[in-house]
Amino acid sequence: MLIQKRISFGYKRNVLNEITVYKEQAEVVKFIFELYAFEQSLSEISKALEMYNTPSPSNKAVWGRQAINNVLSNEKYIGSDDYPQIINSELWNAVQERKCNNNYSKKYISAK
């Protein structure tokens, strides 16, 4: 098994060096996915996280749009052989569909 130096936000290693869910961070991951699925923008999500004094993956007080987008794009959250599931597949699919629609809209609008 290849050992990664850095693991995704929402996870930690246990004493056996296995990747496990880091409960506090996993709640933040769920919160981000749920807000985005319910039509909140990346900026609105950032403001909500700041309001709750939620440290970002880089331990900054403010969550940048890229950090939020990285969470929303990380397939590990739906589970794999090494990573336990944090987000169910229905929520994952809803978020990915919205992201695709947003990207399509931006490309279409900017092409006009």
Q: What is the meaning of each model-derived region?
A:
Residues 1-112:
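Conserved catalytic breakage-reunion loop centered on the nucleophilic residue
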